[in-house]
Design a protein with these regions (language model features):
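A structural motif corresponding to the C-terminal lobe/cap of the Radical SAM core domain
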Residues: 1-138, 142, 149
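Terminal low-complexity segments of carbohydrate-biosynthetic enzymes
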Residues: 121-122, 129-203
Length: 203
């Protein structure tokens, strides 16, 4: 699987991934296993969700027979612990706590910008990308991104390490690096807001 992801990256396609936690077959170390795979594969944008059992699906019917359904799902299985609308095999508090910790680890600046570097180590600018002249708004967007991530953001040192690595080692990948950095920054903001909201919620 790691080789397959690297091959896709080598064709100039950045892989994004969606991952689900909460299956009956998940072992207690599922959080470490997912983190290890995402980091080693260099999947910059990784969306992690908790398993939901939608009504009228085979999963719902099986869990209903087993007496494990708790109610309707929230409708959002990403960054919402209420998505877990059934009794999981792993203890629920253990599952939710591990889920939050996995999100926290994945979107630290060091981890997330490190995955961009890992992705772009194999990256080859595709030949089919249309060449166009640089516009004024391109320059404005780049400087806004550099200001936001390189000056205002906590963990900006990790961003500058990535930036200068790309400038000197993989300059053709700079546009893709900036694109991925912007997406990752959005994920960092959303993840922080989720964890802050959950930590402030009454238990």
């Amino acid at each position: 699987m790691l080789r397959s992801v690297a091959t896709i990256h080598s064709f100039g396609i950045s892989v994004m991934g969606g991952f689900i936690i909460g299956f009956d077959a998940d072992p207690p170390e599922i959080f470490d296993l997912q983190e290890q795979f995402i980091e080693e594969a260099g999947i910059a944008v990784a969306m992690i969700g908790l398993l939901s059992a939608p009504p009228h699906t085979p999963l719902w019917k099986r869990l209903e027979k087993e007496g494990r359904i708790l109610g309707l799902p929230s409708g959002n299985n990403s960054m919402d612990e209420n998505a877990l609308n059934f009794i999981p095999r792993l203890e629920r508090d253990f599952l939710v706590t591990g889920y939050k910790e996995l999100l926290r680890k994945l979107y630290t600046p060091e981890a997330s910008f490190g995955r961009i570097r890992k992705c772009l180590e194999h990256y080859k600018t595709p030949d089919f990308v249309a060449k166009r002249p640089v516009k004024l708004y391109d320059i404005k967007a780049m400087f806004l991104l550099l200001w936001t991530l390189g000056i205002c953001m906590e963990g900006r040192l990790a961003f500058w390490k990535l930036f200068f690595y790309i400038v000197f080692k993989k300059p053709a990948a700079l546009p893709e690096m900036l694109h991925l950095a912007a997406m990752v920054h959005h994920c960092q903001i959303v993840t922080k807001a989720f964890l802050r909201r959950e930590n402030s919620s009454p238990t």
